[in-house]
């Protein structure tokens, strides 16, 4: 995993440099769409087939995305370079690192909120506002439900974890009682 991140970093940084000169959001959409296509097992098997030319693989990838940037010369060059260097499996990691660079520029961060119960509407908005004050940055929440938490939430922002779940509290009580 660390090796993929190391190899993908220069691609993500170069792509972000290109995106800064234009529309970062549009480039973000393009790279996310390309990453989704590159995750498909059928695409990876076609890309590794010696019967399919590199130009055909590039055309296939670009045809599979909806982004208007797919006709951009720099986008075509990116895809062609990844295909030529057999780096298509890196696209999901490039997309992840691109998003991290985008978030850093915006002073934002992705937040994974795992809750025992579904969170929606005002409840989620209130929680996100509270978390933004605590973490001192704008958060982009992704909510997952895990009933094994019993109650409360576990929030992951970058490498920071805030676990206020009932399961975590019970585990800490158990540790305190058995120590």
From Swiss-Prot:
GO cellular component, one term: plasma membrane
Alphabetical UniProt keywords: ATP synthesis, Cell inner membrane, Cell membrane, CF(1), Hydrogen ion transport, Ion transport, Membrane, Transport
Pfam families for the chain: OSCP (PF00213)
InterPro entries assigned: ATP_synth_OSCP/delta_N_sf, ATPase_OSCP/dsu
Recorded superkingdom: Bacteria
Any one GO MF annotation of this record: proton-transporting ATP synthase activity, rotational mechanism
Subcellular location: Cell inner membrane
Main location as per UniProt: membrane
Lipid bilayer topology: Peripheral membrane protein
Signal peptide as annotated in the record: none
Disulfide bridge positions per record: none
Protein role: F(1)F(0) ATP synthase produces ATP from ADP in the presence of a proton or sodium gradient. F-type ATPases consist of two structural domains, F(1) containing the extramembraneous catalytic core and F(0) containing the membrane proton channel, linked together by a central stalk and a peripheral stalk. During catalysis, ATP synthesis in the catalytic domain of F(1) is coupled via a rotary mechanism of the central stalk subunits to proton translocation. This protein is part of the stalk that links CF(0) to CF(1). It either transmits conformational changes from CF(0) to CF(1) or is implicated in proton conduction.
HAMAP family listed in its UniProt record: ATP_synth_delta_bact
Subunit structure of this chain's protein: F-type ATPases have 2 components, F(1) - the catalytic core - and F(0) - the membrane proton channel. F(1) has five subunits: alpha(3), beta(3), gamma(1), delta(1), epsilon(1). F(0) has three main subunits: a(1), b(2) and c(10-14). The alpha and beta chains form an alternating ring which encloses part of the gamma chain. F(1) is attached to F(0) by a central stalk formed by the gamma and epsilon chains, while a peripheral stalk is formed by the delta and b chains.
Family recorded in the similarity comment: Belongs to the ATPase delta chain family.
Protein name: ATP synthase subunit delta
GN (gene name): atpH
């Amino acid at each position: 995993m660390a090796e993929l991140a190391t190899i993908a970093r220069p691609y993500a940084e170069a792509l972000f440099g290109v995106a800064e000169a234009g529309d970062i959001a549009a480039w973000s959409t393009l790279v996310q769409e390309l990453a989704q296509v590159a995750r498909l097992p059928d695409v990876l098997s076609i890309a590794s087939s010696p019967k399919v030319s590199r130009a055909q693989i590039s055309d296939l990838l670009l045809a599979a995305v909806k982004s208007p940037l797919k006709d951009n010369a720099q986008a075509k060059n990116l895809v062609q370079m990844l295909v030529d260097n057999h780096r298509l499996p890196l696209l999901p990691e490039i997309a992840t690192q691109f998003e991290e660079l985008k978030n850093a520029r915006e002073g934002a961060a992705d937040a994974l909120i795992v809750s025992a119960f579904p969170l929606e509407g005002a409840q989620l908005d209130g929680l996100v506002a509270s978390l933004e004050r605590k973490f001192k940055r704008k958060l982009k929440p992704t909510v997952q439900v895990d009933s094994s938490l019993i109650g409360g939430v576990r929030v992951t922002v970058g490498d920071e974890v805030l676990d206020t779940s009932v399961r975590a509290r019970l585990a800490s009580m158990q540790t305190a009682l058995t120590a």
